[in-house]
C-alpha cells in the first residue's frame, strides 16, 4: 500500500500559515532542495488542500529546468476543494466529493508514496482517518509572534501518535523532523 507523507514548514511557535511571508523561508538552499527533490522522487502523486494549491500553482507552474520544479509540474496533483472547478496547473485533479474515501482508494492503488503539502483541515482529517503515515516538519528557527488558531500546527480536537524516525539539520538552521505514525 502507498504511504502518505506530509511535508510542512513550521516555526518554533507552531505557526504553519503563510511561510512566504516569514523572515526567511530557508528551505530552498542547496541542501534543502536536495532533500525536497529526493522526497518528490520517491512519490508519484502530490496531494494538497485548496489553500496550498492556490499558493503553489502560480509559483511552481512558472518554474522549470530543475529536478524539483520539473517533478512538481509533471506529477499528478490531487486537490481537495469544493470551490475549485477549473484548475490551471497541469495534471491537476480536483477531489470535491468524499475526500477521505477517495484518498483511501488512491492510497490502496499500486504505486509509490503520495506527498502532501500544507497542514490544514485536510491533514487533520487524514490523521483522524489513520491515513497520514509520515510527517516531515521543517522546523524554522524563529518565532513569528502572531497568528490565529487556524495559523497553528495544532488544532482543537486533533490527535495522533507519531514516533521520531529521523532528524536532519540544514546549514540554514532549519531542522527537518521526520515522524512516522505509530499506527502504521
Outline where the language-model segments fall:
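Enzymes that bind and transform nitrogen-containing heteroaromatic metabolites
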Residues: 1-184
Amino acid at each position: 500500500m502507498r504511504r502518505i507523507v506530509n511535508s510542512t514548514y513550521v516555526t518554533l511557535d507552531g505557526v504553519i500559515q503563510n511561510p512566504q511571508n516569514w523572515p526567511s523561508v530557508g528551505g530552498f538552499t542547496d541542501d534543502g532542495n536536495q532533500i525536497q527533490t529526493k522526497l518528490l522522487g520517491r512519490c508519484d502523486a502530490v496531494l494538497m488542500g485548496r489553500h496550498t494549491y492556490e499558493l503553489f500553482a502560480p509559483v511552481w507552474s512558472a518554474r522549470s529546468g530543475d529536478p524539483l520544479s520539473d517533478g512538481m509540474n509533471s506529477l499528478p496533483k490531487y486537490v481537495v476543494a469544493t470551490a475549485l472547478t477549473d484548475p490551471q496547473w497541469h495534471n491537476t485533479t480536483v477531489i470535491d466529493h468524499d475526500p477521505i474515501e477517495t484518498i483511501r482508494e488512491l492510497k490502496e492503488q499500486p504505486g509509490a508514496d503520495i506527498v502532501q503539502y500544507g497542514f490544514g483541515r485536510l491533514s487533520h482529517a487524514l490523521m483522524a482517518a489513520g491515513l497520514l503515515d509520515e510527517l516531515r516538519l521543517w522546523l524554522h528557527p524563529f518565532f513569528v509572534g502572531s497568528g490565529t488558531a487556524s495559523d497553528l500546527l495544532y488544532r482543537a480536537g486533533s490527535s495522533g501518535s507519531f514516533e521520531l524516525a529521523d532528524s536532519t539539520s540544514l546549514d540554514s538552521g532549519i531542522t527537518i523532523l521526520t515522524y512516522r505514525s505509530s499506527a502504521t
